[in-house]
């Protein structure tokens, strides 16, 4: 074993061997005994001595040990297989090498250290977003942790003993109210300057946002009515077997939303024909169709220029195709053709170079700066060459396009329903939408930016999607944006994939007649609620919403009541049921009489589907998924996913299943049907609602300063007056804009306060010591399987399986939970911990884990009282 630990330790200590012994004989005997091992001691004189770390390549995380060997008093240690070898990813065998540990060394098999000792980060690692841990967020400013509300028990400790229980409860309720009020005001001050917050609550921004949302909604309504008039919904059913037709309809809606014409809708027919024609080579042919189907000649050339990262075969095919088109255009000069072919050859060779150097490194994310510089140089050269080629070919293009215009042929349809997009995972709350737009506008084909709602658990960071036209080279744009920072925040964009399954199905029980009728009722109610909330059918934006008693102007709801009322033959049933017998029309059912067949009513389904399509296209609400897609007009796919009915259930269904489905579905729809919640006047006053007049008075008073007798100053302008009434008059006359700002600030705060669903910091509950029965985390059967991130602050980590009982056990810290029971089957010394509920932790046994044969023997006086501090 040339590189074992024992051999290496002996080599390190060899230079001290002669100094340790005064007996020459013993020294000679030692050297004679070990002479075979050390006869090549000149081994390291001729070359540079290897560092100690190189001997540990097989286990880099081991701690360096320089302790003397223990061969004086005990027999030589056997070279045993170490239990942590080959188990680096196993939490049971990896020692305590977690990111939380302060030491950073190897495995420690002493007493488990509590996590709260000095040197450990105060904020736990798992609280931060993953990008912060990986370094995508530039600086993590944790700031002061928010205060935690006291429990009633903690609050009682701060009260005098003379306070009775009723008074204590009253004071605690007042404390809670004050705490929440203060927390809300702090939150308002912390976020009032951020764009997302102002757009939600500031009076000026709220008005603009509502106007934009209303304009987008009316555009979607026009698209829906246009598609309905042209018969797109006539034979369309929302069933999973009609997925292709549904996708086609959604694409048509998107083309219309993007301002497309009936001519642009022809692209959908062309794509369908291409799919049917080229099924074997579907992927390649789809790409070709997408690139060239609806683009003009100029756009096709930019497309060819952008698709540099295709494989070399395709590059050669493209160049040969270009040559063919040039031949068909007319006989040019031979010299020009030679130059063009030479340039094409150069381009193709550069394409190959870029493919090997650029594409691979982009995918692996490991391109060096020098490579990126050379690539940018190549890109500039290629752009210059492409521009020169364009200038040469312009006259030819004009000649080619003139006969087309003369013939009066229609323009090619545009694929407006297809886009390219980038996804940005972390956008800081202080970055505005306008900044991202101005950054991305520099690149050709930019369309729009969408930002998600901020996430309180991720420090109010947002996700973003930047949409570009389909003709651009999205990977090149993504690469150019990689290292750009906005306000010290790396955007780190990635290419957003196209949606794979745009039509998804739910349970086929939804085809049943009873459920369909119930869905019609719910969908009609939902349409009515959303139309009233957005005032979509109101004549003017300022008009009040229609009362629910009046019929809606929405044509989709016309005569809807005809389908909501179920016709029953009650009189006939009463007459026939008086004898207690069942109606003769219903034959006795085989099997379970409570089961029924799924009954499908095509007429009802057609009515329901029109309502669901209205909800999906106009209000961006996916009925069967019971969710609303927010800001869908700004997303890359303006009509992306829809959920439809699944295939008919093969078996019969019970009446209970139908009722259960209806009940569950109505519960899921309740949040969408509820009116936007706002606090009542009384609750708002309790939470600190501000009065505009009082705030204006406070503003005037604070800006009226007395300098001396009959001498008053207005600090806003620096002018002096003889009395406070003159200062007041001056402020109202000369600083009216400041007064308006105060009123707007009050409205800003009140809008935030009255929103019942206002954003707030995630509530941090104080760590409560769980009882003995709660020592195991739910879902994790054994204490050794408890993840360290879920354990309370300051609690000692559980012992490693196989070493827990043998290690010296520390005292449980104050406030921490009792030591967890040993796992099931701990065996001797524990007397079945799960049955007795009071046994001390025994040695966990596991056949796959090697225990320590030299574990400390545990002795326990069975008559002694329970104590946690024993071996």
Curated annotation (Swiss-Prot):
The modification Omega-N-methylarginine is found at residues 828, 835, 845. The keyword Membrane does not apply. The modification Phosphotyrosine is found at residue 8. It comes from the Eukaryota. It holds the Pfam family ARS2. It is found in: Nucleus, Nucleoplasm; Cytoplasm. This is Serrate RNA effector molecule homolog. It comes from Pongo abelii (Sumatran orangutan). The lineage of its organism: Eukaryota, Metazoa, Chordata, Craniata, Vertebrata. The gene is SRRT.
């Amino acid at each position: 074993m040339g590189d074992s630990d024992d051999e290496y330790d002996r080599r390190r200590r060899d230079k001290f061997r002669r100094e340790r012994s005064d007996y020459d004989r013993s020294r000679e005997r030692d050297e004679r005994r070990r002479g075979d091992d050390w006869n090549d001691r000149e081994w390291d004189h001729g070359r540079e001595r290897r560092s100690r770390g190189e001997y540990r390549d097989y286990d880099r995380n081991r701690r360096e040990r320089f302790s003397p060997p223990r061969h004086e008093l005990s027999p030589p240690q056997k070279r045993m297989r170490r239990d942590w070898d080959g188990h680096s990813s196993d939490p049971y065998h990896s020692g305590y090498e977690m990111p939380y540990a302060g030491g950073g060394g190897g495995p420690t098999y002493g007493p488990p250290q509590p996590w709260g000792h000095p040197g450990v980060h105060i904020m736990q690692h798992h609280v931060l977003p993953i990008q912060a841990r990986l370094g995508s967020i530039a600086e993590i400013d944790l700031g002061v942790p928010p205060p935690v509300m006291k429990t009633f028990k903690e609050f009682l400790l701060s009260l005098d003993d003379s306070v009775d229980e009723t008074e204590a409860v009253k004071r605690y309720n007042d404390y809670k109210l004050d705490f929440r009020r203060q927390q809300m005001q702090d939150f308002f001050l912390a976020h009032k300057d951020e764009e997302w917050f102002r757009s939600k609550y500031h009076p000026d921004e709220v008005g603009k946002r509502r106007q934009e949302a209303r304009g987008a909604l009316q555009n979607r309504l026009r698209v829906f009515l246009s598609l309905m008039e042209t018969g797109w919904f006539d034979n369309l059913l929302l069933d999973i077997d009609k997925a292709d037709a549904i996708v086609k309809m959604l694409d048509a809606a998107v083309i219309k939303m993007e301002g497309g014409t009936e001519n642009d809708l022809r692209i959908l027919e062309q794509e369908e024909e291409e799919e049917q024609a080229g099924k074997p080579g579907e992927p390649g042919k789809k790409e070709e169709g997408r690139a060239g189907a609806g683009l003009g000649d100029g756009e096709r050339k930019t497309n060819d220029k952008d698709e540099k990262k295709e494989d070399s075969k395709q590059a050669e095919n493209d160049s040969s195709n270009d040559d063919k088109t040039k031949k068909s255009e007319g006989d040019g000069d031979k010299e020009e053709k030679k130059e063009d072919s030479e340039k094409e050859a150069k381009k193709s060779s550069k394409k190959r170079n870029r493919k090997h150097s650029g594409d691979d490194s982009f995918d692996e994310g490991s391109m060096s700066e020098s490579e990126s510089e050379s690539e940018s140089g190549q890109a500039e050269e290629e752009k210059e060459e492409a521009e020169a080629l364009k200038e040469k070919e312009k006259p030819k293009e004009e000649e080619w396009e003139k006969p087309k215009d003369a013939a009066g042929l229609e323009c090619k349809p545009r694929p407006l329903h297809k886009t390219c997009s980038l996804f940005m995972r972390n956008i800081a709350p202080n970055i505005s939408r306008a900044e991202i737009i101005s950054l991305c506008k520099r690149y050709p084909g930019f369309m729009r930016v969408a930002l998600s709602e901020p996430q309180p658990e991720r420090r109010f960071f947002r996700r973003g999607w930047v949409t570009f036209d389909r003709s651009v080279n999205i990977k090149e744009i993504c690469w150019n944006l990689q290292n750009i920072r906005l306000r010290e925040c790396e955007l780190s964009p990635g290419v957003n994939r196209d949606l794979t399954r745009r039509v998804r199905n739910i349970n086929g029980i939804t085809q049943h007649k009873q459920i369909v009728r119930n869905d019609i009722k719910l969908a009609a109610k939902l349409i009515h609620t959303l139309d009233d909330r957005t005032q979509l059918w109101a004549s003017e934006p300022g008009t009040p919403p229609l009362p629910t008693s009046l019929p809606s102007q929405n044509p989709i709801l016309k005569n809807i009541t005809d389908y909501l009322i179920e016709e029953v033959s009650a009189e006939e049933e009463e007459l026939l049921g008086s004898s207690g017998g069942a109606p003769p029309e219903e034959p006795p059912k085989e099997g379970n009489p409570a089961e029924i067949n799924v009954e499908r009513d095509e007429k009802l389904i057609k009515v329901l589907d029109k309502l669901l399509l209205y909800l999906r296209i106009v209000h961006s609400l996916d009925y069967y998924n019971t969710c609303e897609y927010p800001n869908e007009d700004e997303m890359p796919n303006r009509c992306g996913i829809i959920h439809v009915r699944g295939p008919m259930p093969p078996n019969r269904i019970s009446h209970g299943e139908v009722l259960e489905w209806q009940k569950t579905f109505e519960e899921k729809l309740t949040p969408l049907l509820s009116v936007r919640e706002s606090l009542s006047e009384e609750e708002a006053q309790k939470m600190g609602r501000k009065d505009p007049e009082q705030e204006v008075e406070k503003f005037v008073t604070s800006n009226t300063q007395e300098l001396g007798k009959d001498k008053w100053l207005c600090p806003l302008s620096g002018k002096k007056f003889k009395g406070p009434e003159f200062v007041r008059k001056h402020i109202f006359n000369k600083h009216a804009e400041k007064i308006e700002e105060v009123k707007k600030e009050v409205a800003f705060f009140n809008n935030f306060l009255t929103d019942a669903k206002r954003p707030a910091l995630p509530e941090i509950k104080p760590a409560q010591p769980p009882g003995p029965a709660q020592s195991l985390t739910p879902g994790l059967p054994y204490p050794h399987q408890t993840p360290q991130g879920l354990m309370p602050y300051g609690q000692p980590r559980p012992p490693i399986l196989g070493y827990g009982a043998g290690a010296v056990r520390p005292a449980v810290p104050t406030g921490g939970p009792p030591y967890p029971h040993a796992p099931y089957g701990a065996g001797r010394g524990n007397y079945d911990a799960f049955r007795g509920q009071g046994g001390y932790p025994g040695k966990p046994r596991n056949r796959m884990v090697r225990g320590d044969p030299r574990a400390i023997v545990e002795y326990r006086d069975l008559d002694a009282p329970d104590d946690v501090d024993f071996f």
